[in-house]
Amino acid sequence: MKLHYETISPLLKKALEKISKSDLFEDFTLVGGTCLSLQLGHRRSIDIDLFTDIDYGKMNTKLLKSFLQDNFQYHENLESLNDTSMGYSLRVGDNIRETVKIDFFYTDKFIFPAIEIDQIKLADPKEIAAMKIGAITQDIPRQKDFWDIHELSDKYLFQDMVEWGIKRNEWTISENDIIKGFQKIDDILESPEGIDCLKGKYWELIKDDLKELVGDFINNKKR
């Protein structure tokens, strides 16, 4: 598979390559919108989400901090790495005006093996589907999560994505939670920064498609 580097900025690509080439990050997997955009090429993405399913407290934040200090001229919030936490949101780059947001977070165990392309360890799109399904059950779901689910629905059955979402979040969400999440779609605020779609899709049509998918899913359950 060729990655869609046109979906990310040159600065993000450079940061991702630096990190991916270091053994220090072997326990981390790229997830989120950037991971999906690189594989599907459907929209631009602007940050780096790196998740690890190692045991809590095992992240070597001291070495992470040293690496980021040594490899990036500019950085923000590195002092947060001095404390043990579920995750860290940082910024790195060339200067104060040219930065990339990088998140390092603990996560539940991955349910699909990662994929390695160009030395980048990427979550399987099925894993991202499971994560996105979980994300739309939150109190205030994000527009881009619905957008990504719509793109994934061209590749996978909705029923399968629901099952993966429950498997990955078995203690926290149910099928009913997922349906309720989709029922909020008309109330979702559009992303302030907008969604730079590379496939000519429109939010109103995406909403209609997803409503139909969920409606069919519910009707099939009643049979």
Describe the function of each predicted region.
Residues 1-223:
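Compositionally biased terminal segments of proteins
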